[in-house]
Each structure stands twice: as C-alpha cells, then as structure tokens.
Amino acid sequence: MRSSMRIFVLGTVLCLAMAGAALACTSVMVGKKATADGSVLVSYTCDGWYDHRLKVIPGGSHKKGEMVPVYHNICYQTRPGKELKKVGEIPQVEKTYTYFHVGYPIMNEKSVVMGEYTWGGREENECQNAIFMIEQLQVLGLQRGATAREVIKIMGELAEKYGYADGGEALTVGDKDEIWLFEITGPGPLWTPESGKPGAVWAAVRCPDDSYAMGSNRSRIAEIDFDDKDNYMYSPNVKSFAEEQGWWKEGELFVFHKLYNPEPYGSPYYQQRREWRAYNLLSPSVKLAEDAAEQYPLFQKPDKPVAPQDLMALCRDVLEGTRFDMTKGMAAGPFGTPTRYAVTKDMKPEDRKGNDWNRSISLFRCSYSFVGQVRDNLPEPLAAVAWFGEDQPITTCYVPIYAGTKTVPESYNTGDRIKFDPKSTWWAFNFVGNWADLNFAAMIGDIRAEQKRLEGKFFAEQADFEKKAAELYKKDPKKASEMITKHVGDYMTQLDKDWWALAWNLVGKYNDGYRITSDTLEPLGYPTDWLKAVGFGDHDAEPKK
C-alpha cells in the first residue's frame, strides 16, 4: 500500500512538473468576417525549450491491422534528458494526411491550422494511467482530420478512449471556414481504461465569424450552452466529473474555466497582461481594465479588420508605449532590452517571493512562432499558409509555408540546442536575438529594417504567386505541388542566408561599445538617466548601493 502510494505521488508530481514546464505559450484566433481578406487567422508563440525543427511528415495509405506508437516527450526532442518514450500503441487508420511537425504541430495538407497554450488545471484531474500528451493528440488529429471540427472530435474521442495524461491544455484549431478553442484536462487519478468512463474532460467553443479570442496559460472557455451543438462540443463527462468532485451541481451556472482552472498558474498578471494587451491592440475602443479581477470576455470584435501582419506585430509585442513597457526602466538595463531572465524563488527578495517580472507576448525563450492564414478561395495546397518564424518573435522574420509544401530546407529541420550550429536557421535567429541584447536600443532598428524588407517582399509577391500556382493546379496538380515546394524552399533558403548575413553585420557594426561603419566610429555610451541612477562620477571606493 505504501509502495503504491509512493508511485502514485511520484507520478502525479512528474505530471505536474511536465505541465508546469509548458506554461508559457500564447495563441490568438480570428474569425473569417473579422479579417482583412476573409481568411481565418491563428497565431501561436511556443515559449520555452521545445523542438524548433520543422519537418514535413508525409501522409499515406495504411494496411488493416497496422498500429501507431504513442509517445511522451515528443515536444522536447532537442532538450537533454527528455528522451522519446513509447507508452503504448493504437490502431492505425486507413488514410493519413501530411502534416507539419515541430514541438507542437501547426498545420496539415487539408489546411487545418493549430495553436496551443497550457493552463495547468487541478490536481484532481491528473492521471498516471492515461497515455496521451497534448502534442501526440495534435499529431493524430492533424494526420486524421480534414476540418477543424473533425480534428477536435478525433482528439476528443481518442483521449476519452485511451486517457489523457497531460495537464490542462488548449488548442486553437482552424480551417478555411471557422476556428475553435479546444480545452482538455485529465480524468482523475482513479481512471483506468477498463473503467468504462471517459479518459478525459474536454470542451470546445466556436469563435464567432466576426470576432477574435486570445488565450495565454489559463482556461478561457466560459459558460457552455449545452443545447447549441453548432457552436459547442464537449465530452460526455464534462458536467458529471465536476459534480462528482463537488465543484458544481445541477441548476448552477456551468462556467468551464471556473470549475477546471479556478487558480491559474504563476504570478497574478502572468496571463492577464498578455490578454489585456491583445484586446487593447485589436479593440482599443473597448478600453478593458488593465488589472481586472475577473477574466476578460473571451470574444471581442476588432476595431478594424485583422491582417496577418497585425498578428505578427502582436506576437512581437513587448508592451511598448504602455506603463508596463518592457524596454523602459532599470530592469531594461542601460540599453532598453525587453529580456527578463527567469528568477528562482531563492533569488527573489523576501517580500517579493510571490511576484515576478511583467510578461509580454514576445519572450526571449520562445522556440518558434507562426501566424496561420487560411482562405476559402484557393485550391487546397494553397489555401493555408503558415507564416513561420524561428526563435523569439521580436527578432524573427516570418516566411510563408503553404499546406501543399512537400519538403523544407534542411537548415530548418536541424540544430542541436546545446551546441552552436551555423548550419541551423534556428541558430541564426537565436544568435541575432542574443547579440541584440548587448545593446537592444541600437540594434533593433537594423533588425526591424530587415524584417520589413523581407516580409514586405513575401507579402508583395504573395498574390501573384498564388494566382499562377492556382492556375497551374487546375492543369497539373503534381507540377503545382512542385512549384509550391520550390517557391517555399527558395524563400526559406534566402531567409537563412540573409539572416546569417544580418548576424555577422551586427557583430561588426556593434562591438566594444561602438556603432561602426566604413567611415565612422560612434561611441554609444550610456543614457544620462541611467548614469545618474548608478552613481556615475561618484568618487567613493565602493560601488553605489
């Protein structure tokens, strides 16, 4: 009995530790009538040490009786000590679709796109007898589903049958017509596959076509209308589990996030600051309170139609121009860096143990981000485009990758995270981001100029390329596929080359405290206010305290 209890406690702790490690991501979803071009949009920032390597995993036909392995640690495959672990297998389906694999998969050939964020949840939902982590569900959903609704149903049914072992998770799942928010948590420690009960608790809500929504590490689904099957989906135990736990009883208002995530993770404004910023930028007329005690309404209408570039800007945001501006104040150092490294509890002052830095949407430890754009007026291989960026958003550059792309350059699917690799595109972006922190205020202008030049080119050429590729697709789908793959590969290869060139240009231009050009050597020095704050000119033997 004691041994069993020790195993149970250890398993629970490990599950919570894995969930806690992923509590960092941000996603925004936008309905098709709220966008500038009628597309469905989604954005996602993968904010932690996750697999940055982008790979195209081909679909195919499968024989009856084939089995699919189920793994843990899929998302961690560049992190030491996180080996891929097989925990089971399930029957394969007759046909699977090609999908785009990265730490948390983002798109399939059927133009379904997907973002993610973790929300932790309650200990009462943790389960060690289940097998599915969220990224494995994403893989299977994208391999097997042709629409957002279909993908959600597939993931929900698989989790119910085989059990969900991860912490509370959310996925923003879109296609050419609609986009949904899917949230899932575990069935509790007593669940077993033989119990006959669902192995997960989940719910999904459809984003109104004229609205958008934002999520950042806390459950966001509010009241569920159980009679509205067009706009809500849920597991059969979503009410009964809460009732069995004593959290809810029939006749009371059923608010999913209050029942399954009543105490969100982290410092008080870890999630809220990002949510407020997104709504503040896209719907400034609403004037949401900066420090609201309650959650903001999930859905809002934007003040103006949203374009992919708006979501890119949102991903890159560091609260500039607000009283929380990450580039201002002593914490930004003399050169205005928005980077705030993690602070362990023992490092914090005694009266600040429960506090932390402000949290912006762009984060230095981001592995990759993307903006998904799905249209209903283009053939399937062109309908969805993932504007993909390696490393932190504020210093990345987004390159378009179409759903019909068959391969991507090797530099995008390689790179050891513990060893600098000049053959890895991720390292080009990570290097630029880290070098910029030496003097962010000076270097960010060079970086933004290159972002504007390259992304401007990609957007300017988008319509013409899509028109030509769509015309070719009508005549010869195979040649159109080759055209798409070459176009994407050429862009990605050029971006890799140009970003390494930018990296070495920054090294030469900004070093030893100077801005160096062919005919000037300009000392950058320090801001006057910062010099005063640190006691510049004092003749004391000891540094100013």
Label the predicted regions.
Residues 240-385, 389:
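Glycine-rich, aromatic-lined ligand/substrate-binding cores of catalytic
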Residues 338-472:
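Substrate-recognition/cap regions that form aromatic- and gly/pro-loop-enriched pockets
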Residues 454-545:
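Histidine-centered catalytic/metal-binding microenvironments
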Residues 9-19:
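Bacterial N-terminal signal peptides
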Residues 1-7:
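Positively charged n-region of N-terminal signal peptides that target proteins for export
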Residues 124-128, 136-145:
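Second-shell loop/turn segments in exported
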Residues 25-133, 154-306:
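A contiguous strand-loop segment
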